[in-house]
Amino acid sequence: NLQPSDPADEAAGLAFNLTQPVARPGNPDTLTSLLNSILNLSAVRMVDLDASNLERYGLAQPKYLLELVTLTGKEVLIRIGDSAGNGQYYVTSTALPAIMTVQADALTAVDLPLTDYVDRFVALMSIWKVSSVSLDLEGEQHELGLSVEEGQKITDETVELTLDGQDAKIISQSGENLFSTFYQTLIGIRIDGFDLAASPDGPVTSRITYTLKPDPASQSDAKALVIEFVSRDAYTDYVLIDGSYTGFYVSHRDTFTSGQVGQEGLLVAVSQLQYAIDHAVDGVFDTSKGYPAIS
């Protein structure tokens, strides 16, 4: 489902939402490329003006079936069938009911994995929309407190940031806000793949609960957003949001245990933030000295 952010404003760009096989915000870069490649398809050669013999060209059961619906309700169906050789594919459409070929490289954006079409961030939460976050990371409990209003800088004096009740407004020797670094790790959890047939029924191993502020714009009350993780195998975890399976999973290492510098998992990142709080001098922690290894 592709729709303009504001149908009355052509300059507003496009907002993309997928409804099948999963309901997710779309990746605007990939889907813009997909849409442009479809709209700009041009025939290399005309093969048959009679489009009744679809089976001969692999178009009766096409590799790809693309349905475009305009804002006025007009529908165009595009079928992409067998290879025609020479780097081309057979194509037909309801807009031009004939058999033609198109260049295969014009269809690059059509043949991508599902992960490329979706917004891969599990829950990208703006910091000013959140009042607190409860973390249960494999049994390790933490509580984040946030007092940031839209338009404020995280370094403003009136902003309060806490980890388990401690002042967490710690900066590095270069001025980097270490709470902000941790928060980016928290909201930066990314989808690793899809398992649409799964029905996770194992125990929840980790949980992230965001408490969201009331939103006057949408007239919504304060509410909780609960993200839960259930082990899929030794390497990945299913993701549930507000108790419902999302259809996707994440890398356990990337999400929780990675010690790679700049790509730390949550268990490592929260330990580093606590270490910085414990060893900061006048609110400054020298990250160049490093952190202790996390066992």
Range-by-range predicted roles:
Residues 1-295:
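Soluble, acidic/polar mature domains that operate outside membranes
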